[in-house]
C-alpha cells in the first residue's frame, strides 16, 4: 500500500487585536488539552443515504450532511444507520444558493433551513417527444412568499455524431417564464409553446408556476440531437440577507409542524461561506451581518485552495483571501471540506470534552463550530498499487495537542504549540509554521514550538492575528529523492498538498501529469 499524499496539514486561528487593551480572541482558551476528544466532522459534504457508512468508516463521528435540490437537512440521521452506529452524531445542515442579489453558496450548519426542489425525470432521452409532469409545486403568489413559486428548468443537448446543427422545440404548461431576481415576465408574457432552442440558446430558464403541476414537452430529432440534461430545480430566490435571517432566526414550520428555519441550538452552529469567489469587501459584508456568520472555506477538494485549473489553483485564491480578511481585523474561521468528493481530502476536527450522551455531544459539536474550537486537516490519501484510493482513505490522527496563549502580567506573550499522532514510520518529520499579517513569521522543525508575539516600539502587540500550520512529511519522496527540511520549508501549502509518489484518481489530481510527482524536489 502506498500513499498518494505525503503531508498532513492542520490550520487553526488565533486573532489578536493590537489596540491599547490588547484584546485577544483565542478560540482555544477553554480547551482542556489533557482530556479533549478529537471529533472528525465536515461543514459541507454532499452524500446519499448509501454513502453514510462509508463516511463513518473513514473516521467521521459528526455527520451534518448538506445536500441541495432540495436543500433539506438529513437529520435525524436514518434510523438503520444510527442503530448500526450508536455513537454517531448528526446535525441539520444544507447548502443554500441562488439568492437574488449575490452569487453566494453557503451552508447553515445546525440550521433547519429548508428550501428548494429538485427532480430529474427518468425518461428515454433517445426518443421524441419527451414528456413529463412535475407535481407538488408551489403556485406563485406575489403577496405571500413568492420565491416558493419560482423554478429553474435545465435543458441541455448537443449534436449527435456528424449530425450537424442540433435543436429542440420546447413547450411548458402550468408556468410562465420569469426573472428569478425580480419575478418579472418578459414582454411576450412568458408563454413557452413550441419554442425553438438551438445550441446558442440559454441552457436554463426560470419559470413562475401558475399551477401545482408543470407539464414539459421536448420535441427533437434523435438522429440530429442528443438530450444530455433535463431537470426542474429550485433555489432560495431571496436576497441573501433574508436567507441568512431565515437560516439563523427563522421560525417557519412545514405542514407536519417540523421546523424548516432557524438553528437547532441558539448557542451553536452558524453560516459558512462556500468556495468563496468574491472580494474582501463583499466577504466583510457577509461577516459583519451577524457574528453567527463564521467564516469561509479555505480548502475545497474540487479546487484545492481555490481554482479549477492548475494555473489558477497555484495562486491559492481561497487561502490568500482568508489572510486578506484576517488583515482587516475580522474574525474569520477557515473550513476544510470535500464538498461532493467522498474520496477526497479536507476535514474539520472538533475539539470537544469527553463523555456525554448523544444529545449533549450534538450540542457540543455545534458549539465547537460556533466558537472556533476546531482545526482544519488534510490527511494523506491512502491508495493501492493501482493508484486508486482505498481504506482508510484520508483519515489521519495527526493533531494539535496544545495551542496555548501564554501570558505574563496579564499580557499575551507567546503562542505555545505541540502536535502528535503522525505515522512516524511513513512521515517522521514535523514542521510548524506561524503566520501573521506579515506572512510566515516563524518556522520550527519539530513537534513543538513557541512563537513570541512581536511588539512595536510602544510595547503593543505588533500583529493582528496568528495562524498555525503543522506538517508531517517523509525523509524521501518521488522514488527516493531526499526531502530535507530546507527543501520542505521552501514549499507553500499548495505545493505541499500536491506532493505524491503515486497518481490517484479522485479530486484535483486531474491537474497532474500522467506519472509521478508534480514537483522536482
List where the protein language model places each region.
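Bacterial N-terminal signal peptides that target proteins for export
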Residues: 1-7
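Post-cleavage N-terminal segment of exported redox proteins
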Residues: 4, 17-20
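Alpha-helical structural motif
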Residues: 6, 318, 361-365
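Bacterial N-terminal signal peptides
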Residues: 7-16
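C-terminal functional module detector
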Residues: 21-35, 48, 128-231, 328-333, ...
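A metal-dependent hydrolase metal-coordination microenvironment
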Residues: 22-138, 143, 148, 221-283, ...
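Non-transmembrane alpha-helical segments in soluble domains
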Residues: 244-248, 323-326, 366, 370
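Glycoside hydrolase catalytic-domain groove-lining segments
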Residues: 312-335
